[in-house]
Structure formats: C-alpha cells, structure tokens
Amino acid sequence: MPQQIVHNTGVNYSLYYNVLNYFKTIMRNHPSIQSVTYGDIDTIDDKSYPEYPLGNILITDTSFGTSTTTFTIQLIVADKQKLLNNESSGSTNAQTIPFYGVDDMVDIHANTLAILNDLTSYTQRGVAGFEINSDITCTPFSDRFDNGLAGWSANFELTTHNDKNRCLFFFN
C-alpha cells in the first residue's frame, strides 16, 4: 500500500530514522520498484527478495556542521539478470533489436538509471526539508555482488538543517 508523502518542513530530517523513512517511502511509492531494503547490499539474500527491481538505501557517512547535518547517501536500484533466447524465425517474426545480446543488461541499466533519476529529481525539487548540494554520481554494476543483480548505484550528499538544541541536556 503506498504511503503518503507530505511536504512538511516541520519534519526533523537531521534524525537518521527520518532520512531512512523518507527514502523508503519514495522507493515504495515508485511504480517500478517492487521491494525496498536497507543496509549493505552484499548481505541481501536474493532468494528472500524475489520481486525485482529492488531499491536499497545506505547511509555511509554523516557529518555535523554548525547548523547542518550532512548525510552521505547511497541509493541502489537493481534487477535480476535474465538470459534471453532469440526464438523468432527470420521468415515470420524478424525483429530489429539494437542492443541484442545473451542477457538483458542494457534494459536493466536503462530502467534502473531512469528510476534513480526519478528518485533523486524528486528529492532535489520536491522536499523543502533538505537539499542535495553537489552532483549525484551514478555508477553501473553487473557482477559486483555475485548474485545475478545488475543496476546502478547513486551516491550524493544530503544536507539538512540541525538546530542543535542546547536545552535538551543539563549538566551539573
């Protein structure tokens, strides 16, 4: 069931859980993503997530500024590679496939990059609570995880406001 995304500047996006929940929500609401995970994608059991493509969220680093929190985010969108067989006969069902090969790698890379573009574009322009101030670096992969997954990884820094409330702790 899709979750509602509310444009709420009152959400404290400097909290780790709120950043994770934001990306989990937009990934679950994307029409092409079938399952969403968190953490190191090397540990994902591909038998536990039979629905593809899958989205994965990982916060790799965090730094505190004077009034900001900056998260280094890695989003991965991956799909399971499938072998393709050219079963058409030349006389009845000839097709011109510009990138035909033994698997669907080009299709997976095209689709997963488009999904990452959707997710990062929405994050850049649709949310008032944080900003992506630098370029988003996307890297394709195919044999990186030794589990038949292929797709793209996007890395970027997400900056949020952090008021660092000093009234929360009293020292004696």
Can you say where each PLM-predicted feature lies in the sequence?
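Mixed-charge, glycine-accented linear interaction segment located at domain edges/termini
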Residues: 170-172
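Small/polar-rich, solvent-exposed N-terminal microdomains that initiate assembly or binding
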Residues: 1-68
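Oligomerization/assembly interface segments of phage tail-like spikes and tubes
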Residues: 67-82, 148-162
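Acidic-leaning, charged glycine-interspersed low-complexity segments
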Residues: 47-52, 103-159
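Extracellular/virion structural assembly segments
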Residues: 2-20, 67-69, 77-120
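A generic structural signal for ordered alpha-helices
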Residues: 35, 53, 90-93, 97, ...
